[in-house]
């Protein structure tokens, strides 16, 4: 063993000696501290007394070829102010069954008294082919210092363990502005060993090494500190997040480890906990799940088999005044995304996104459960609710999105969106259940109701929107899309506003105007359409209010009319729902019930009938005006089935009377020429009068349809019996003028 340079004076620098080369058997060598092939150790530099001294540790010896142990390299012990040093390198392991040398065990830079010191941990030794282990890096403990953890050793090729990464803190900086990075783990073995080096695991069934466990930057006292967490292991390593507790500090959570290829579990990433004013942070990402049955991580992506997805960054994005943050990504299986909780004045935040459902039968993740923006103390805060998770493909349930609860004066918020339903038989997600804008203390607040979730192909239902603010303006929720089978469409609830003089949509009381909610679209099969806005179109307690009822659903929905109880108000009843495509009945529109003096109202419109044999909707059932001197109009009846009228007219064409009328029309048109508008007008008039005389029960519309069909039949007969010469395609406009003039003369 060669002795190193012992520099004891101020500013001295020394390098450890190299050990000698030993014999080929078991002797110990020297020469600059390189150990023998047996078990030699290299001595490090002991620059112990002077300020500003720098030194490097010795290199460990080469291990023996038989069963010897590799040497250890001693680190630099720099105990003075501002000193910097690097740990020693571990020795090479033996080729047989011996252990690989440990890395520099000494401190990288133990500059305990002064600021600004920097140091790096030692590198672990190369493992042997049997079971060698890598070294550990030591931390830097000085004020304001920056340090990096040591690198783990390379694992063995057989069943040995890979080296552990730098276990010490990357930079335990207690002063202002300190920054540091955690250590990297060692590379794992190719067989079943445990991994290290950034947490890369083994290729077989071994467990991945742990990543940098120390905090990226624990800048606990001052502002502006930044740090990043360590990388997790491949198997089950965890990445430690940045714990930035100082004012204005920014930090990012650690990344979880990559899951194993067998059955390992993915790591979970811790979020950034920024508790001071104005701080911003992002939650950590979970680890990637295993390909077999392991649990996932990394942004919450789940396993490909049946494992559960890892949880996303659960910590709050930012809990400070005016701070903004985003929740973590939920897991693919059942992970939840935590929303941003901004509890200070005027803060803005967005809720987390729900997790993706599993591919088997797992449940879809819940949307951001935290409040989008809980701006409880100040005015003008804005926030958006979380988005619901995607449902599973099997039988899982879609997620729910929590709305924004803005309780401050004049606050504005939007409700969350409901989750997508699954493809099997699960239920579609409910829309944002929270209030659109619960601005209970001040006037003028605005908010929008939530959108109902898309129904599944089974029986999903849409959500409802509620708006309860004083003087606020809010819109009711939109009903969900109905299912394709027999499910029911969602209901859209109107806005129930209890204050006066508010202006907006959906049932604002007072002098304002409101509109009812929209009903859901009905199903394509035989399901029932959603009900229209059930809330009052305009429940006005004052004079002059105006409102419109909600639109009914596609199947058999009903539109609730405007229930106006005020004096002098003008209201219109609701519109009936669109009939179903099969045999559904059109909706009924409730009329306007105006109970005050001098009020004027119009009845509701009936629904459109079905395309098949459905009935047309009934007109406005309510009273047009129940007051003295009032003027009102009755409701309009529904439009009947157009298809049934046309089919009936076509069936009458085969009667002998119709054939006689067509023959007479052919004779008149041929004798008068093709461009004689007077002859065409006379022919149409004669056919209409003859049909009406022979069919006294037909309506005027039915007679007109029958006459036009017979005139078209006559024209086809003329074309089929003629020799058609050159056709002037450019004079089609002249023909349309002739037909229009003839119809006007015959029926006008």
Curated annotation (Swiss-Prot):
Gene Ontology cellular component terms for the protein in this record: extracellular region
Chief subcellular location: secreted
Ranges: Sequence repeats: 1-25, 26-38, 39-66, 67-96, 97-130, 131-158, 159-191, 192-204, 205-235, 236-262, 263-292, 293-305, 306-333, 334-360, 361-394, 395-424, 425-458, 459-485, 486-512, 513-525, 526-555, 556-582, 583-612, 613-642, 643-655
Localization in the cell: Secreted, Extracellular space
Function of the molecule: Spiders' major ampullate silk possesses unique characteristics of strength and elasticity. Fibroin consists of pseudocrystalline regions of antiparallel beta-sheet interspersed with elastic amorphous segments.
Entry's free-text remark on domains: Highly repetitive protein characterized by regions of polyalanine and glycine-rich repeating units.
Name the UniProt record assigns to this protein: Spidroin-1
Annotated source species: Trichonephila clavipes (Golden silk orbweaver)
């Amino acid at each position: 063993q060669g002795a190193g340079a012992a520099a004891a004076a101020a500013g001295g620098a020394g390098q450890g000696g190299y050990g000698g080369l030993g014999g080929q058997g078991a002797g110990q060598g020297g020469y600059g501290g390189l150990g023998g092939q047996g078990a030699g150790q290299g001595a490090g530099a002991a620059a112990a007394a002077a300020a500003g001294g720098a030194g490097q540790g010795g290199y460990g010896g080469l291990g023996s070829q038989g069963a010897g142990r590799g040497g250890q390299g001693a680190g630099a012990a720099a105990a003075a102010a501002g000193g910097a040093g690097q740990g020693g390198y571990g020795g090479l392991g033996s080729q047989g069954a011996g252990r690989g040398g440990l890395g520099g065990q000494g401190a990288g830079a133990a500059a305990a008294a002064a600021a600004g010191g920097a140091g790096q941990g030692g590198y672990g030794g190369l493992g042997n082919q049997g079971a060698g282990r890598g070294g550990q890096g030591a931390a830097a403990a000085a004020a304001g210092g920056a340090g990096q953890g040591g690198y783990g050793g390379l694992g063995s090729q057989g069943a040995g363990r890979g080296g552990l990464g730098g276990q010490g803190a990357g930079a335990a900086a207690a002063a202002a502005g300190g920054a540091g990075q955690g250590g990297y783990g060692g590379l794992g073995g190719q067989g079943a060993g445990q991994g290290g080096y950034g947490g890369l695991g083994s290729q077989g069934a071994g467990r991945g090494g742990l990543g940098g466990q120390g905090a990226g930057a624990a800048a606990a006292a001052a502002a502006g500190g930044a740090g990043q967490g360590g990388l997790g292991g491949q198997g089950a390593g965890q990445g430690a997040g940045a714990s930035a507790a100082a004012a204005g500090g920014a930090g990012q959570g650690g990344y979880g480890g990559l899951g194993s290829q067998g059955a390992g579990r993915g790591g979970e990433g811790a979020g950034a906990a920024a508790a001071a004013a104005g701080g911003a942070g992002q939650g950590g990402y979970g680890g990637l799940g295993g390909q077999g049955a392991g649990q996932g991580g990394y942004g919450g992506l789940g396993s490909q088999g049946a494992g559960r997805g890892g949880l996303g960054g659960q910590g709050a994005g930012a809990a400070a005044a005016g701070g903004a943050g985003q929740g973590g990504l939920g897991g693919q299986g059942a992970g939840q995304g935590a929303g941003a909780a901004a509890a200070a004045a005027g803060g803005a935040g967005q809720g987390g996104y729900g997790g993706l459902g599993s591919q088997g039968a797992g449940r879809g993740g819940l949307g951001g459960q935290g409040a989008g923006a809980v701006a409880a103390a100040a005015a003008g805060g804005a926030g958006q609710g979380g988005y619901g998770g995607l449902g599973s493909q099997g039988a899982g349930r879609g997620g729910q999105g929590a709305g924004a609860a803005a309780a401050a004066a004049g606050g504005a918020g939007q409700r969350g969106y409901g989750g997508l339903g699954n493809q099997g038989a699960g239920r579609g997600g409910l829309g944002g259940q929270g209030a659109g804008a619960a601005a209970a203390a001040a006037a003028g607040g605005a908010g929008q109701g939530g959108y109902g979730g898309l129904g599944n192909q089974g029986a999903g239902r849409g959500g409802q929107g509620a708006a309860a603010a004083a003087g606020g303006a809010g819109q009711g929720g939109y009903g969900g899309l109905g299912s394709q089978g027999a499910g029911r469409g969602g209901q859209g609830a109107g806005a129930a506003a209890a204050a006066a003089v508010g202006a907006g949509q959906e049932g604002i009381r007072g002098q304002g105007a409101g509109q009812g909610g929209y009903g859901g679209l009905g199903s394509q099969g035989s399901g029932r359409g959603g009900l229209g806005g059930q809330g009052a179109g305009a429940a006005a307690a004052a004079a002059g209010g105006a409102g419109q009822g909600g639109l009914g659903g596609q199947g058999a929905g009903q539109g609730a009319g405007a229930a106006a109880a005020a004096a002098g108000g003008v209201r219109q009843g609701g519109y009936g729902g669109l009939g179903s495509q099969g045999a559904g009945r059109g909706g009924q529109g409730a009329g306007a019930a105006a109970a005050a003096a001098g009020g004027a109202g119009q009845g509701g419109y009936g629904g459109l009938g079905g395309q098949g044999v459905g009935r047309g909707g009934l007109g406005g059932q309510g009273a047009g005006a129940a007051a003295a001197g009032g003027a009102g109009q009755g409701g309009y009846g529904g439009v009947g089935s157009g298809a049934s009228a046309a089919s009936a007219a076509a069936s009458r064409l085969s009667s002998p009377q119709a054939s006689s009328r067509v023959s007479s029309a052919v004779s008149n048109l041929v004798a008068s020429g093709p461009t004689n508008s007077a002859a065409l007008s006379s022919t149409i008039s004669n056919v209409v009068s003859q049909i009406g005389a022979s069919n006294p029960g037909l309506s005027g519309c039915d007679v007109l349809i029958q006459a036009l069909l017979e005139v078209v039949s006559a024209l086809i007969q003329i074309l089929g019996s003629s020799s058609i010469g050159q056709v002037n395609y450019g004079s089609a406009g002249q023909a349309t003028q002739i037909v229009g003039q003839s119809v006007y003369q015959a029926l006008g």
